[in-house]
Amino acid sequence: KYLASLLSGIVLFGAVACSSNDDTVKDTAKPVITDEGITANPVDCQVYNRGESISFRYRFTDNQELGNYNLEIHNNFDHHTHGTQGQSCELDQKKEATKNAFYYNKDFSIPSGSKAYDASQEIKIPATAEPGDYHFVIRVTDQTGNQQIRAMAIKIK
């Protein structure tokens, strides 16, 4: 009787441990970075002056739940690309960056449970920033880790 109970327990454990839940659907959809319904900023080829602020405005959406976003500004003095730019812009001559090349990189949270979020930030360009070509990069991640990237070429005068 003990052996039968032990054998039944092992079989039951094996059935539970090996069962799969095919009803679970993994979220593989990337979040969306859009200007739909808002006036987005910045856009490709936009020009800013040193000492001014960039008024960042974009809408993010996701099929399940947004997570967070990151904004990065880095120099494009070497004319590299990110493959997400909407249009090509007139570039200055290639050059080496100096210590005054502007660099910005900051993470921002999105309220829990959000499927849509209108993001806005004011980013001050230092008066001492090196003029030239820059990339403004937006990264949005949803709660399951899917990420969308959008990079725009901007110029600082």
Question: What does each model-identified segment do?
Answer:
Residues 2-3, 9-39:
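Bacterial Sec-dependent N-terminal signal peptides
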Residues 27-157:
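First exposed extracellular module after export/assembly in secreted or surface-exposed proteins
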Residues 4-5, 150:
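Generic early N-terminus positional signal peaking at residue ~5-7
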